[in-house]
Amino acid sequence: MPFVGGAESGDPLGAGRPIGDDECEQYTSSVSLARMLYGGDLAEWVPRVHPKTTIERQQHGPVTFPNASAPTARCVTVVRAPMGSGKTTALIRWLREAIHSPDTSVLVVSCRRSFTQTLATRFAESGLVDFVTYFSSTNYIMNDRPFHRLIVQVESLHRVGPNLLNNYDVLVLDEVMSTLGQLYSPTMQQLGRVDALMLRLLRICPRIIAMDATANAQLVDFLCGLRGEKNVHVVVGEYAMPGFSARRCLFLPRLGTELLQAALRPPGPPSGPSPDASPEARGATFFGELEARLGGGDNICIFSSTVSFAEIVARFCRQFTDRVLLLHSLTPLGDVTTWGQYRVVIYTTVVTVGLSFDPLHFDGMFAYVKPMNYGPDMVSVYQSLGRVRTLRKGELLIYMDGSGARSEPVFTPMLLNHVVSSCGQWPAQFSQVTNLLCRRFKGRCDASACDTSLGRGSRIYNKFRYKHYFERCTLACLSDSLNILHMLLTLNCIRVRFWGHDDTLTPKDFCLFLRGVHFDALRAQRDLRELRCRDPEASLPAQAAETEEVGLFVEKYLRSDVAPAEIVALMRNLNSLMGRTRFIYLALLEACLRVPMATRSSAIFRRIYDHYATGVIPTINVTGELELVALPPTLNVTPVWELLCLCSTMAARLHWDSAAGGSGRTFGPDDVLDLLTPHYDRYMQLVFELGHCNVTDGLLLSEEAVKRVADALSGCPPRGSVSETDHAVALFKIIWGELFGVQMAKSTQTFPGAGRVKNLTKQTIVGLLDAHHIDHSACRTHRQLYALLMAHKREFAGARFKLRVPAWGRCLRTHSSSANPNADIILEAALSELPTEAWPMMQGAVNFSTL
């Protein structure tokens, strides 16, 4: 059994659902959890758990599929094989065998538009000319020929009519794990329908091919449950083409921003000492290695997980060659076949599954990976690293930037590196603590599934929810992200090393490497900020003032007296998904404060939610252009309502007003604990579900063993113990900062309250004295009470805080800015559509006094 806490503390997890032995082994092993989730254990797991399912291991060549016409062929085939193992080629060969007549119908479900187009091109070039894509349909619903052989993106599955959907002979799920992962994407507008349609296809389709480099036990288990063990065949490919198996990956400890600054420094007299030119100093750095290869004439491809770093590294490369191609979400993707015309190609996750470059043109690859709460996740990074199929020198150099990971002590790494485990063995204390954290994470995911009505109604969505949370929540910790990427590369037959170490790695080596990377990222952060390409300057206030869509946006969300320049600044912030999400949550909070009954009636809140959180809003992109962006629907509104109910209560106690800058009164750590205590566990669960922040509970963090392991795996110097109030302050900060974009700042005020000390009223002073149990029975006048308060000034000397709204938050319509009865006509009109019974009742009648 896994470690469950110290003898004195009992079980820090509390009463929870017991985990069975097999499930415990799968989900609570911090060393092998990533291996399980990405299919590395299929060859051992299938015979043990589903003995009637046949399994075929292919080790010595490109993957092959079972004979489609063989009488013993099973109806479901799951293929797990690395990138570069020939899966798509084998699929095309299999389809040629399986399509016996012109009437044989095939549905191919993909995960991305680019993948759909690439697959259609490959099919056509291979003689499968009858396949069409959903792009060619002139009607919204596709219900007849030529769509009997269709390649469709999973988000558009609901556009396939019942005449076709119920009669497909073959279902192909290429990149099946990515396809199922799209169920959790903001672009999924019809989740319930798509989930139900996919489930129907998986149940009734005569032949199914599901293939992916990371197909895992969850997928096989799900298909065995739907179709029966005897009808499932699993192919495990353990071969990768030399373009991958001969590739050598090296994790670098330093970025080398001093070399970057020197290369980009404008001509003129030197402003300081030149960077260290020693081979040792340059060799351990990203930019030192890149400079050496570009100077030596190599052709290099570079992956960057952020657009801003892609822009910076492009500027660096242009110091060596003009033939630099930069590809990200803000540039045209172009034709991949033209990459051979460039010495350097730099790309982000915009180049992913479905797009690949096969010619032997590039000598090596560099990768800059910055784990951040809003992605990209490590699977997307891994897929993007495989877009260039061959490298002359087989070199892949990776720098992990830890500055985007969370530094708060309540975020605890829960994964252990698998190479360290096989070479030097992690100390028992490390494995006990991290196994416990994995178990706690599984329990939190299970609680999410139990609480969500949507999850109960959507079987596929619910089945793979754990993997979605795992990939998002682990982005908070540098070591977790590094371990996941390390495992994915290892499973793809790529040899991975850390700079300064051979294939063996001890726990001490790994923790020291993490610490070095962590501190280097913090040092490099300021340099990168100075060099970052700034948004182009554009004068947009006049255009914003004259645009109808902006006018409607202002009327709906903002105060009437907001200046055009403030509107422009807000629309720039709304260009990111994170900015839009926080804006909507803060707008909903203000609406709940203006209409308090929204916290007592789900129908009222739902109407307010539909009013503010749906439709389109104007944004300004990085090129300075006005752009309308659709707000993604929230898949389940219930936890959003619960969050707003709890936070509006907190906001009212803190005298919250966005227009006034945030909280109207200051508060101390004890006040924070008091605010959170009634619903502490629910706050942690809601932050997990809505913010993808896996906060370790305070009881666990009070364990000395947990604290030591967390310090070692976080790459940080030893930190003190986390007290109950410390934990509450950290959780409070995450709730407001991560979900609403609100910062918690230290206040300079000695005493609670919104005003200056000398302006405190007699009643306020009495309240302060009573709160600190200071006897004031001998004081009658304001002067006497004030003198007594000042005499006990030291008792109020603890840290005090205020919540500060971001600059754009001051533009929002609030309860104070809506004092005018006509100030919120649009919301009033929306609420007027609610039936009378939706409003709170008192003795059978609407309670008008509370409206």
UniProtKB/Swiss-Prot annotation:
InterPro entries: Helicase_ATP-bd, P-loop_NTPase, Replication_origin-bd. GO terms for cellular component: host cell nucleus. Residues 1-21 are annotated as: Disordered. Keywords: ATP-binding, DNA replication, DNA-binding, Host nucleus, Nucleotide-binding. GO terms for molecular function: ATP binding; DNA replication origin binding. Its main location: host cell. Changing I204T: In strain: Nonneuroinvasive mutant HF10 and 17 syn+. Functions as a docking protein to recruit essential components of the viral replication machinery to viral DNA origins. In the presence of the major DNA-binding protein, opens dsDNA leading to a conformational change in the origin that facilitates DNA unwinding and subsequent replication. This is Replication origin-binding protein. One of its GO terms (biological process) is DNA replication. Homodimer. Interacts with the major DNA-binding protein ICP8. Interacts with the helicase/primase component UL8 and the polymerase accessory protein UL42. It comes from Human herpesvirus 1 (strain 17) (HHV-1). PROSITE patterns: HELICASE_ATP_BIND_1.
